[in-house]
């Protein structure tokens, strides 16, 4: 029974990471669309990194370092192999990434 409970908890935790990946994809693509609507140079063809940097430059995102860390973590999250890495990712999502998503949502309204 204890092993089953641990497995269920891990499934939920890995699901949180999967939802972060999806949310990040939607966020940077929404930012790209907003930048295109504002006529920002490079918005139409930019990579996620370029879009995030441009969004920071034009004050759509508050903290470029957090967004670039999100990009890095999104790219490496498929290679999380142990519980400590899952713990670290969950804490980053809770403490840094969710507030950044909320900030972008407020800015885009």
Region annotations inferred by a language model:
Residues 1-109:
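Solvent-exposed interaction patches of small proteins and small membrane subunits
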């Amino acid at each position: 029974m204890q092993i089953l409970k641990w497995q269920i908890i891990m499934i939920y935790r890995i699901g949180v990471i999967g939802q972060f990946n999806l949310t990040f994809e939607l966020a940077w693509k929404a930012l790209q669309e907003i930048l295109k609507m504002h006529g920002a140079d490079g918005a139409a063809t930019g990579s996620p990194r370029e879009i995030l940097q441009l969004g920071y430059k034009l004050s759509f995102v508050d903290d470029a370092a957090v967004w670039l860390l999100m990009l890095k973590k999104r790219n490496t999250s498929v290679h999380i192999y142990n519980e400590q890495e899952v713990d670290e990712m969950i804490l980053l999502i809770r403490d840094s990434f969710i507030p950044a998503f909320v900030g972008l949502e407020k800015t885009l309204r």
